[in-house]
Amino acid sequence: MWGGRAGALLRVWGLWPAGVLGRRPLSCNAASLAGSNPSGCWNCGSPGGPVRGDGFFCPQCRALQPPDLTRDYFSLMDCNRSFRVDTAKLQQRYQQLQRLVHPDFFSQRSQTEKDFSEKHSTLVNDAYKTLLAPLSRGLYLLKLRGVEIPEGTDYEMDRQFLMEIMEMNEKLAEAQSEAAMKEIESVVRVKQKELTDNVSRAFERDDFEKAKEILTKMRYFSNVEEKIKLKKIPV
């Protein structure tokens, strides 16, 4: 199959898309900070149940509680589970959470709380980065729906698309000036914008197979973007 041969060439060139790990815009509100502590507070033994306020601290002794690993990134960052995200509000939420759980604020607390703080901060960072970029957001949203894109396959990409990627790679390999690389960057940026709009519509229709196809293409172009960045770094 031609696609298989093209895939082999893409692997040789290092252009195989690497894995990446994010409707209505998100809304940030105080209610989203509520959580639960079903097993009770580790510090004072306060019984579990609904936790008022920020949801990260025991309402009785105010000890930082362990992260809720069952909570998905959209819930943590107070977003609707949607591809459409208000990135300004997402950033506000990120800053809000880091002001609550960043390790710098726990230097004088118990070792247990220091450890929990590290875990909370890492989780918030991962959630923010994932939902900020359209590609990783889309892949994560698919994963929540039980749909994943296998690594190391061309996912039945059509011949025309694979030819486009290979030609772009050839141009990048031949590019000897910053202007030439900027031209390729511009083309990729336009392609990614178009694909982002298309995948947004696919998610709105709950057409996850179409979203999967589009995100695979976005992953190819993202790989090209990384190659451009590497080529710009002085040796």
PLM region descriptions:
Residues 2-235:
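C-terminal accessory/regulatory regions appended to core domains
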